[in-house]
């Protein structure tokens, strides 16, 4: 028996939609990253983009456990000397682009390379419940029912 190796032309990509309301960020991010890479499939091939197209809605209503909402810091650098900036997860979630907390969590679980950038392109994250992908007929994936630890009261 030969080891199966998927060809890019043989891959059938599905569209899935996940409602992030009340879900724990890290637990949601691991499951989304696994779907984006295609590791949930028996036909997974490391060098081929065989994952699904994932739509995440209500990303502004994700939950961080413990004191991470106040204490977790996100850093960026302006490019100038001494130009490191930090923002708390709370300020980002209450700010203009609250979906970035979830995007960064998922991005950091995907390999950093050409294939990883393609796989991140298959992710669409929306802060609210509205999304423009109804024409793709996405399949609903209920993350909350997989494990009781996946949800947390806000």
Swiss-Prot record:
One of its GO terms (molecular function) is mRNA binding. This protein is one of the early assembly proteins of the 50S ribosomal subunit, although it is not seen to bind rRNA by itself. It is important during the early stages of 50S assembly. Part of the 50S ribosomal subunit. GO terms for biological process: negative regulation of translation; translation. This is Large ribosomal subunit protein uL13. Belongs to the universal ribosomal protein uL13 family. The keyword Flavoprotein does not apply. GO terms for cellular component: cytosolic large ribosomal subunit. The keyword Ribosomal protein applies. InterPro entries: Ribosomal_uL13 (IPR005822), Ribosomal_uL13_bac-type (IPR005823), Ribosomal_uL13_sf (IPR036899). Gene3D superfamilies: Ribosomal protein L13 (3.90.1180.10). Coiled coil: none annotated. Keywords: Ribonucleoprotein, Ribosomal protein.
